[in-house]
C-alpha cells in the first residue's frame, strides 16, 4: 500500500479577511488533497452530494471570491485511490448540498471528517473559527454572499447531476412507454 500525503489546502475568502484577520477571525474554505486530487464540500439546494473535486490549490476553479492561502501537511494514508473514491462516495451521502450549514456542516467540517478518516487527524482549529463565531452571532450566515456557500467549481457538478437526473427520467419514461406497447412472447425466458 502507498503512503500518500494528506494535505489541507486553505483558501482565503474574498477581501473580508483583510479586515477580520486582525480580530482573529478569518473566512476560509478548505479541501483535502490526496493522490493529486482535491476534494471539498459546498452547499446547494438539492438533495444530492455537495462534495466536489478541483485541481489541488487552484482557487480559480472555486471562483473570484477565493484566493489560495496555504497548504498544510496533516499526515499520510495507506488507503488506495480506489478506497478513497469509495470513502468520498459515502461521505457524499452525509454531506449533501442541501445539508450545508455555515455553523454545523460546512467545507471545513467536511475537510476535518475526511482527514480523520484518512490519517486520524483533525484540521487546525483556526481554519473553522468562523463556524464557532457564527454560533455567537446567528444572523451572520444570512449576511454572507450566496457564492461563498456554493463555490463555482460545485456549480458545474450541480449542473451535471441535474442533467443526469433529467436523462434518467427521460429514459425511464421512454422505456415505460415501450414496455406497455410491446407484447411479451409466451414461452421465452430471459437470463439475468
Swiss-Prot record:
Write down the EC number: 3.4.19.12, 3.1.2.22
Record field: catalytic activity: Thiol-dependent hydrolysis of ester, thioester, amide, peptide and isopeptide bonds formed by the C-terminal Gly of ubiquitin (a 76-residue protein attached to proteins as an intracellular targeting signal); S-hexadecanoyl-L-cysteinyl-[protein] + H2O = L-cysteinyl-[protein] + hexadecanoate + H(+)
One BP annotation, GO: protein deubiquitination
Does the keyword Hydrolase belong to this entry? Answer: yes
Q: What is the protein name for this chain? A: Deubiquitinase DESI2
Report the family membership: Belongs to the DeSI family.
* Biased composition, class Acidic residues, residue ranges: 162-171
The compartments listed are: Cytoplasm
Q: Where is this region: Disordered?
A: 160-192
Q: Which segment of the chain is annotated as a signal peptide?
A: none
Q: Which SMART domains match?
A: DUF862
**Source organism:** Xenopus laevis (African clawed frog)
Q: Where does the record place the PPPDE domain? A: 4-148
GO terms for MF:
cysteine-type deubiquitinase activity; deubiquitinase activity; long-chain fatty acyl-CoA hydrolase activity; palmitoyl-(protein) hydrolase activity
Q: Which InterPro entries match?
A: PPPDE_dom, PPPDE_sf
Q: Which UniProt keywords apply?
A: Cytoplasm, Hydrolase, Protease, Ubl conjugation pathway
Q: What does this protein do?
A: Has deubiquitinating activity towards 'Lys-48'- and 'Lys-63'-linked polyubiquitin chains. Exhibits palmitoyl protein thioesterase (S-depalmitoylation) activity towards synthetic substrates 4-methylumbelliferyl-6-S-palmitoyl-beta-D-glucopyranoside and S-depalmitoylation probe 5 (DPP-5).
**Where is this chain compositionally biased, Low complexity type?**
172-182
What positions does UniProt annotate as the active site of this protein? 29, 107
Listed GO cellular component terms? Answer: cytoplasm
Amino acid at each position: 500500500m502507498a503512503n500518500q500525503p494528506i494535505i489541507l489546502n486553505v483558501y482565503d475568502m474574498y477581501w473580508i479577511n483583510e479586515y477580520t484577520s486582525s480580530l482573529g477571525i478569518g473566512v476560509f474554505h478548505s479541501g483535502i488533497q490526496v493522490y493529486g486530487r482535491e476534494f471539498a464540500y459546498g452547499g446547494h439546494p438539492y438533495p444530492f452530494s455537495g462534495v466536489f473535486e478541483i485541481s489541488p490549490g487552484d482557487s480559480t476553479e472555486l471562483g473570484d471570491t477565493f484566493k489560495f492561502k496555504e497548504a498544510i501537511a496533516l499526515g499520510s494514508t495507506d488507503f488506495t485511490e480506489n478506497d478513497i473514491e469509495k470513502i468520498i462516495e459515502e461521505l457524499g451521502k452525509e454531506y449533501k448540498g442541501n445539508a450545508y450549514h455555515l455553523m454545523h456542516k460546512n467545507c471545513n467540517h467536511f475537510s476535518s471528517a475526511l482527514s480523520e478518516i484518512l490519517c486520524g487527524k483533525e484540521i487546525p482549529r483556526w481554519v473553522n473559527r468562523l463556524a464557532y463565531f457564527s454560533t455567537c452571532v446567528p444572523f451572520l450566515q444570512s449576511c454572507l454572499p450566496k457564492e461563498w456557500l456554493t463555490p463555482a467549481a460545485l456549480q458545474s457538478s450541480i449542473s451535471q447531476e441535474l442533467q443526469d437526473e433529467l436523462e434518467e427520467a427521460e429514459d425511464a419514461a421512454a422505456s415505460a412507454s415501450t414496455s406497455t406497447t410491446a407484447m411479451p412472447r409466451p414461452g421465452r425466458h430471459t437470463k439475468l
